[in-house]
């Protein structure tokens, strides 16, 4: 077959096609079963598992891209690690990996391959995405039960205040998942209003530790300075993050690093098994909240405990 030409379409038709499809989907997003705030590995995994079970899921992501820190393995190196038994997730995604020559319980994979496969799996399952969309507040009901998310377009946040006043809008959901990573921004809204106590967020307030202390218009470090969670301890952190993932308030579930921040847990650094399995646990917590009559998400078999140091 030889190429002849593209189908005929003019500029106005292109614009209408984009606008029509986006509007139709966004109208569906105004009332949904679950809103997942944050499109990193834990949020994507939760979305994939829920959508696989016919739960309506919308991911809100403030960046133009999905994946969070999953695109890199740390220190600008694009190899990532997962500790056994989480390599089973890579098997499910069709991502090749090798076991480290020093530790056969540590699987190493290409980060771009793993991240793009995770994004594809969530989209293929039916999760809807609203990227360049920033979470600004929660929708609440009696006793501050969480009932949705207040959002605005991300670029609005970067405009000088004196130039713009753009009100946000609200999306309703039966459950919201905080998968926003280090900052745990959804839970923070309840904490700052005295609705719940979060050890890590309280630490931030007491010690003025934050993700980025640079001023407007300045370049700053990305803030890996233990803003709310504790310092790095891989073996301790990953198990506890998975164990403590779940419901923290009516209508609100945490997943991934937001769980570490909420509970003041240690952090795991550049290894992603806990992020992926936490997303699965979060999906189960959401289904419990929704009373979904579908099979629960299975977790891979527990790895053998590490040998004590000599």
UniProtKB/Swiss-Prot annotation:
Residues binding glycine: 267
Top EC class for this record: transferase
E.C. number: 2.4.2.60
GO molecular function: cysteine-dependent adenosine diphosphate thiazole synthase activity; iron ion binding
The record's account of how the chain is modified after translation: During the catalytic reaction, a sulfide is transferred from Cys-165 to a reaction intermediate, generating a dehydroalanine residue.
Pfam families xrefs: Thi4 (PF01946)
Cofactor(s) it depends on: Fe(2+)
Role played: Involved in biosynthesis of the thiamine precursor thiazole. Catalyzes the conversion of NAD and glycine to adenosine diphosphate 5-(2-hydroxyethyl)-4-methylthiazole-2-carboxylic acid (ADT), an adenylated thiazole intermediate. The reaction includes an iron-dependent sulfide transfer from a conserved cysteine residue of the protein to a thiazole intermediate. The enzyme can only undergo a single turnover, which suggests it is a suicide enzyme.
Family: Belongs to the THI4 family.
Subunit structure comment from the entry: Homooctamer; tetramer of dimers.
Name listed for the protein in its UniProt record: Thiamine thiazole synthase
Organism of origin: Halobacterium salinarum (strain ATCC 700922 / JCM 11081 / NRC-1) (Halobacterium halobium)
Gene: thi4
């Amino acid at each position: 077959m030889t190429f002849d030409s593209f189908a005929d379409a003019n500029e106005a038709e292109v614009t209408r096609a984009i606008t029509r499809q986006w509007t139709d989907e966004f109208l569906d997003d105004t009332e949904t079963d679950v809103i997942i705030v944050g499109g990193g590995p834990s949020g994507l995994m939760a979305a994939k598992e829920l959508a696989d079970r016919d739960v309506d899921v919308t991911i809100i992501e403030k960046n133009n891209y999905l994946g969070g820190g999953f695109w890199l393995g740390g220190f600008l190196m694009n190899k990532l690690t997962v500790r056994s038994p989480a390599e089973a997730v890579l098997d499910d995604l069709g991502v090749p990996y090798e076991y480290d020559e020093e530790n056969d319980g540590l699987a190493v994979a290409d980060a771009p391959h793993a991240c793009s496969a995770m994004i594809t799996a969530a989209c293929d399952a039916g999760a809807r995405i609203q990227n360049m969309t920033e979470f600004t507040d929660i929708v609440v009901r009696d006793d501050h039960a969480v009932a949705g998310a207040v959002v605005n377009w991300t670029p609005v946040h970067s405009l000088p205040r004196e130039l713009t006043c753009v009100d946000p809008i609200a999306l309703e959901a039966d459950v919201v998942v905080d998968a926003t990573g280090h900052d745990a921004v959804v839970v923070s809204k309840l904490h700052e209003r005295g609705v719940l106590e979060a050890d890590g967020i309280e630490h931030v307030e007491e010690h003025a530790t934050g993700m980025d202390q640079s001023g407007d218009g300045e370049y700053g470090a990305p803030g890996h300075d233990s803003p709310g969670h504790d310092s790095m301890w891989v073996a301790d952190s990953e198990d506890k993050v998975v164990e403590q993932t779940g419901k923290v308030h009516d209508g609100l579930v945490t997943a991934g690093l937001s769980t570490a921040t909420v509970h003041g847990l240690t952090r795991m650094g550049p290894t992603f098994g806990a992020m992926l399995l936490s997303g699965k646990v979060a999906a189960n917590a959401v289904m419990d909240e929704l009373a979904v009559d579908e099979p629960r998400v299975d977790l891979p078999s527990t790895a053998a405990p590490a040998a004590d140091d000599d």
